């Protein structure tokens, strides 16, 4: 239906665009109730798109409940994110409720069960790329409960958005610097990669980017072995020591996961002719001190605080909150990776 000659947007224009009657539009705009949330959202979005000149109500009258599900928050990265979610819950705007669910386990079945537990309007989750998780996301999508993935994506699922960083670029960056900084033994050198396992898309993408960049640079470094330590510091230390004994030509270690303490302990065992370079992830209290005193060469931080904030903005925009200005469809995350070395550390270490 065309607009009136004056160009004024009428309730009938909004009704036509939203696919409802003008009486329904009137009930929504004047907040008279008796309209479902989905129809209310459709009407508000149509009015916004058409530029209806009046103060519009919120797309949702009831409180929108968001569940952030985080596993094994004893790890520094997840601890930082859990802390930020706690901060967000204290200062979120009216009409939002943030629940923080902390899990002791991160196996796919436990995570998937947690996702389906309770009644929420949105779920934000850090989860492995596994069939159980895909099924849980798809089930929530059918319930009109959008899912935002954090830190590690679950590609090919029905999730609404990914709020993390580009892990391929992170892996490429690690390889770029390591290939140019590492010493060579007779012109050659080996590098070892440590990760949780490739079940987490973040680690798989980092390793892929790292390997591709090493091959593209062709500067005499060879990826000798990938060690899977489950992000457990002690297990990672033990496995790394075994690996270093097999590869005395190792000149660099790239930790694509979170067990930085295990790497430092393995290097401290002095199993190599010379100390290897160590590139890892996340700026924590521990890595801050390791970077400052030279035990760690570089750290690539993925800004978990910004990821939590972006995930919240995605949900807010999806439900029609006016305050969501960063997150717009198709919801491409702009969270950056930040490279830290000894010369650009914050003056004070993180908590």
Which ranges hold each PLM region?
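Short, solvent-exposed amphipathic alpha-helices that sit
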Residues: 76-91, 170-174, 201-220, 262-263, ...
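Flexible loop/hinge segments that line or gate small-molecule binding clefts
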Residues: 132-169, 284-292, 296
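Hydrophobic alpha-helical segments within soluble ligand-binding/sensing domains
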Residues: 163-189, 236-237, 283, 287, ...
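Short beta-strand elements in bilobed, periplasmic/extracellular small-molecule ligand-binding domains
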Residues: 85, 89-112, 190-192, 214-233, ...
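Hinge/cleft segment of the Venus flytrap/periplasmic-binding protein
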Residues: 46, 198, 214, 303-351
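Amphipathic helical "hinge" segments at domain boundaries
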Residues: 54-110
């Amino acid at each position: 239906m065309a607009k009136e000659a004056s160009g004024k947007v009428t309730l009938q224009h909004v009704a036509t665009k939203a696919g409802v009657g003008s009486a329904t539009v009137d009930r929504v705009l004047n907040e008279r109730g008796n309209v479902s949330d989905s129809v209310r959202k459709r009407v508000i979005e149509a009015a916004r798109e058409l530029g209806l000149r009046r103060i519009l109500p919120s797309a949702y009258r009831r409180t929108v409940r968001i569940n952030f599900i985080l596993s094994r928050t004893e790890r520094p990265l997840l601890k930082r994110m859990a802390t930020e979610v706690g901060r967000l819950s204290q200062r979120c705007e009216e009409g939002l409720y943030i629940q923080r669910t902390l899990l002791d386990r991160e196996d796919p079945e436990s995570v998937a069960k947690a996702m389906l537990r309770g009644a929420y309007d949105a779920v934000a989750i850090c989860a492995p790329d596994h069939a159980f998780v895909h099924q849980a996301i798809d089930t929530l999508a059918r319930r009109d409960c959008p899912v935002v993935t954090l830190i590690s994506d679950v590609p090919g699922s029905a999730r609404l958005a990914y709020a993390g960083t580009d892990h391929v670029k992170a892996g490429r960056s690690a390889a770029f610097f390591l290939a140019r900084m590492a010493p060579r033994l007779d012109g050659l050198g080996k590098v070892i990669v440590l990760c949780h396992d490739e079940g987490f898309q973040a680690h798989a993408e980092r390793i892929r980017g790292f390997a591709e960049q090493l091959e593209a640079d062709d500067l005499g470094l060879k990826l000798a072995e990938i060690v899977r330590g489950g992000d457990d510091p002690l297990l990672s230390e033990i496995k790394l020591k075994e690996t270093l004994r097999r590869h005395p030509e190792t000149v660099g270690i790239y930790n694509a996961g979170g067990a930085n303490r295990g790497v430092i302990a393995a290097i401290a065992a002095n199993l190599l002719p010379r100390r290897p370079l160590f590139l890892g992830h996340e700026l924590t209290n521990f890595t801050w001190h390791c970077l400052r005193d030279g035990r760690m060469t570089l750290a690539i931080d993925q800004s978990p605080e910004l990821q939590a904030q972006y995930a919240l903005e995605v949900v807010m925009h999806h439900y029609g909150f006016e305050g969501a200005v960063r997150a717009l469809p198709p919801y491409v995350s702009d969270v950056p990776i930040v490279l830290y070395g000894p010369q650009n550390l914050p003056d004070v270490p993180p908590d």
